[in-house]
Every structure is written in structure tokens, then in C-alpha cells.
Amino acid sequence: MSDALLNAGRQTLMLELQEASRLPERLGDDFVRAANIIIHCEGKVIVSGIGKSGHIGKKIAATLASTGTPAFFVHPAEALHGDLGMIESRDVMLFISYSGGAKELDLIIPRLEDKSVALLAMTGKPHSPLGRAAKAVLDISVEREACPMHLAPTSSTVNTLMMGDALAMAVMQARGFNEEDFARSHPAGALGARLLNNVHHLMRQGDAIPQVMLATSVMDAMLELSRTGLGLVAVCDEQHVVKGVFTDGDLRRWLVGGGALTTPVSEAMTPNGITLQAQSRAIDAKELLMKRKITAAPVVDENGKLTGAINLQDFYQAGII
């Protein structure tokens, strides 16, 4: 029984891969035309399709939207019952139908022509009514479905998804869409956390900032170290400009060397220690701490004045790993 299941699964994958392997050679003028129509679209891309094509269409619309192309999915039945009103002349419709003869097209195509909406087709029948009406046809045809009965859309839905990805990625690259653009549309994701957060978004502020003045004694600096638990204290002048840092390591070295606790901390600190700019990207700041093998640092403004403090745990808690 297990061998039969494994063989069926492997056969399905092999058939789907075989059909998908034919897609690259089909990309030509129509693919370029479709991509350019989307690139120059001043409105939105509306993706539509019925059944399994509709399910894949939702994914294609989501991929376009998350990679810099305003897009959404409209079900053909809903389009014919009012949602066509959302479609304007500056929009583009990408209709997915393997047969290219969905009955809804008989009503949708004339309405699109009335509105001068550019129609793109993704179909297995390029010479179907859908293919003939479209400005560009993306051929997703297969010689056979992976379904043993040749009925359930399998190879054809894989081809549809792959063609949609190919189109979305080509448009994305042509737009110059980059990681930061992607992060802006995914602010709650890991990439958004990595690229959108600056140090000032994550740093500790107010009473949570460990700080002392240059004339503060080593004893009082030690108490400040203990109070905040960050492993360092920022040592500032009277204008709150950071002049150095006093760390747990500095304290140990001072005591081992016989230093007095009444001595000003300015004599025991590390002068000109690492500081982070409040406006710098959090991911860059975290990588700097890792590179220098330190766990925390004061945060300063453009004038070097203390505005906060941050440690590696603050980055990790924000999802910046």
C-alpha cells in the first residue's frame, strides 16, 4: 500500500514538472506585451477566474500587490452583479480560463471593451474567445493533467501559478522594486521588522537609559550599572554629549587594578566607545554590535547627545534576528 501511494505521488510530481518545463520556451512577444501593459498601467490590475483558476488568480493578485503592482481579485459572477463598476478605463484585467470559453466572458468582454480596459489572457487555448479578445495571451496549456482520470486541474494549475509568478517577477524587476519596498507592504513580517525599524524605534528611553556625568564616582557608576542591567553606562559631559562608556568589564578591570571607588568614572571608562545613531537602521546597528562583539551601546543624535540605549535583546524581541 505504501509503495502504491509513493508511486502515485512521485508520478504526479513528475508529470507536473514535465509540463512546467515547457513554459520557458513559450515566453515571447506576448509575455513582453503583457508585462509592459501592466508596467504602464495607471490604475489597478484586476485578476479574475472561475473555479481552480480563480483560486490561483487570488494568489497571483496577492503576489502582484505585494511586489509593487496594485492588484486585487474579482470573481466573474460578482463582476457581473455590480463589481464591474469598480473597474475603470485605466485598469487592466487579467482573466484566467484554461478553456478560454467561460460563459461569463460573453458578458464581461463587451463591458471591458466599452470601458477601454486592456484585457490580458492566461489560457490553455490561445485561439479561444478569450485569447482572441485579449491584447496579450499567456499560454498555460498542458498535454495532460497529472490526474489519473485527466479531469482534476493539476498540471494546468501549476502552470498557471508559475506563469503568474513569472509575470509578477518580471514586472517587479522592471519597476526596480527592492527589499525596502517589499518591507513597506509587509510591515508585520520579519522582513518589515528588519528593514523598517530604526534604532530610535527600539531604544530604551527616559529612566531606562543608564547614564552618569564625567565627575560621577566609580561607586555611583557601579550603582547605575546595577540599576539598569544593560551592562554599560553612558558617561556624558554637562551638555549630555557622550564622552565614553563604563561597562561591567571596565569595572572589573578597575577593581582588579586596585582603583578606588571614589575616583571619577572618567578615569575608569572606555573613552570614545561605540555609539549608535538614533536614525540608523536597526538591522545595521545590530550587525555593528555583533561585529564588535558587544551587547549594548548608547544611542546618540546627530550632535552626539545621548537619546537612548539599546542592547541585542531589544533587537531580538523586535524580530530582528
Swiss-Prot record:
<protein>
    <recommendedName>
        <fullName>Arabinose 5-phosphate isomerase GutQ</fullName>
        <ecNumber>5.3.1.13</ecNumber>
    </recommendedName>
</protein>
<dbReference type="GO" id="GO:0005524">
    <property type="term" value="F:ATP binding"/>
</dbReference>
<feature type="binding site">
    <location>
        <position position="75"/>
    </location>
    <ligand>
        <name>substrate</name>
    </ligand>
</feature>
<feature type="binding site">
    <location>
        <begin position="49"/>
        <end position="54"/>
    </location>
    <ligand>
        <name>ATP</name>
    </ligand>
</feature>
<dbReference type="Pfam" id="PF01380">
    <property type="entry name" value="SIS"/>
</dbReference>
<feature type="site" description="Catalytically relevant">
    <location>
        <position position="104"/>
    </location>
</feature>
<feature type="binding site">
    <location>
        <begin position="141"/>
        <end position="143"/>
    </location>
    <ligand>
        <name>substrate</name>
    </ligand>
</feature>
<feature type="binding site">
    <location>
        <begin position="68"/>
        <end position="69"/>
    </location>
    <ligand>
        <name>substrate</name>
    </ligand>
</feature>
<comment type="similarity">
    <text>Belongs to the SIS family. GutQ/KpsF subfamily.</text>
</comment>
<feature type="binding site">
    <location>
        <position position="75"/>
    </location>
    <ligand>
        <name>Zn(2+)</name>
    </ligand>
</feature>
<keyword id="KW-0547">Nucleotide-binding</keyword>
<dbReference type="InterPro" id="IPR046342">
    <property type="entry name" value="CBS_dom_sf"/>
</dbReference>
<feature type="domain" description="CBS 1">
    <location>
        <begin position="203"/>
        <end position="261"/>
    </location>
</feature>
<dbReference type="InterPro" id="IPR035474">
    <property type="entry name" value="SIS_Kpsf"/>
</dbReference>
<keyword id="KW-0862">Zinc</keyword>
<keyword id="KW-0677">Repeat</keyword>
<feature type="domain" description="SIS">
    <location>
        <begin position="34"/>
        <end position="177"/>
    </location>
</feature>
<feature type="site" description="Catalytically relevant">
    <location>
        <position position="186"/>
    </location>
</feature>
<dbReference type="InterPro" id="IPR000644">
    <property type="entry name" value="CBS_dom"/>
</dbReference>
<feature type="site" description="Catalytically relevant">
    <location>
        <position position="145"/>
    </location>
</feature>
<feature type="domain" description="CBS 2">
    <location>
        <begin position="269"/>
        <end position="321"/>
    </location>
</feature>
<feature type="binding site">
    <location>
        <position position="81"/>
    </location>
    <ligand>
        <name>substrate</name>
    </ligand>
</feature>
<feature type="binding site">
    <location>
        <begin position="107"/>
        <end position="116"/>
    </location>
    <ligand>
        <name>substrate</name>
    </ligand>
</feature>
<dbReference type="InterPro" id="IPR046348">
    <property type="entry name" value="SIS_dom_sf"/>
</dbReference>
<comment type="function">
    <text>Catalyzes the reversible aldol-ketol isomerization between D-ribulose 5-phosphate (Ru5P) and D-arabinose 5-phosphate (A5P). It is also able of sustaining the biosynthetic pathway of 3-deoxy-D-manno-octulosonate (KDO), a unique 8-carbon sugar component of lipopolysaccharides (LPSs).</text>
</comment>
<feature type="site" description="Catalytically relevant">
    <location>
        <position position="52"/>
    </location>
</feature>
<feature type="binding site">
    <location>
        <position position="267"/>
    </location>
    <ligand>
        <name>substrate</name>
    </ligand>
</feature>
<keyword id="KW-0067">ATP-binding</keyword>
<dbReference type="GO" id="GO:0046872">
    <property type="term" value="F:metal ion binding"/>
</dbReference>
<keyword id="KW-0448">Lipopolysaccharide biosynthesis</keyword>
<dbReference type="InterPro" id="IPR050986">
    <property type="entry name" value="GutQ/KpsF_isomerases"/>
</dbReference>
<dbReference type="InterPro" id="IPR004800">
    <property type="entry name" value="KdsD/KpsF-type"/>
</dbReference>
<comment type="subunit">
    <text>Homotetramer.</text>
</comment>
<dbReference type="GO" id="GO:0019146">
    <property type="term" value="F:arabinose-5-phosphate isomerase activity"/>
</dbReference>
<dbReference type="GO" id="GO:0019294">
    <property type="term" value="P:keto-3-deoxy-D-manno-octulosonic acid biosynthetic process"/>
</dbReference>
<keyword id="KW-0129">CBS domain</keyword>
<keyword id="KW-0413">Isomerase</keyword>
<dbReference type="InterPro" id="IPR001347">
    <property type="entry name" value="SIS_dom"/>
</dbReference>
<keyword id="KW-0479">Metal-binding</keyword>
<dbReference type="Pfam" id="PF00571">
    <property type="entry name" value="CBS"/>
</dbReference>
